[in-house]
Amino acid sequence: KTAMEFSTTTARAEAVKTDAIAVGVFADGELTPSARALDKATRGSIKAAIQSGDMTGKRGTQLALRGLPGVAAARVLLVGLGSRDDFSDRAFAEAVRSVIKASPGVAEIAAAATEWAVKGRDSEWAARQFAIAAREAMFRSDELKSKKDDVNGPSKALLIVPARHVGAERGLKQGTAIANGMALTKRLGNLPPNI
């Protein structure tokens, strides 16, 4: 399987036609802007999931909602981001990896990850880290196996940005290049020295 491809879109969250769209929810039930937009488009489905206790917003949690009316995506993946005050670089990377790992059989996923604000970080940083963490979640070391592991995660990832944003596009390109280098290094490190 080829490496995951990344691109940006400026479409509104509810209008992105994709297999899955990932939006963030903080631990206090606070919705990120795209989650609020999806909640409005679905007449309260996101808030209903929070009020019922199905989604707590606790760091590392996810909830997939399928076939929501008013949303172009086939499923909405709510991603628990934890406490806004404690949301760090590490928490951002964990959230991205959890999105990818929670998306088996999905060919394309969109994520509003630039909204998952880490203090002191901009959208270029978020885009770069998104690409690195997503590719890291998809990495498999099976060069020497006769039967390769099935990689059934997304092959395309769309990063939703609020407006045409050169920094986010540059960050995605940088992140993709860094992820390619990291994957090559891991593959070479996993090979025996006599190859």
Regions found by a protein language model. Give the residues of each.
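N-terminal hydrophobic/helix-forming segments and targeting peptides
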Residues: 1-195
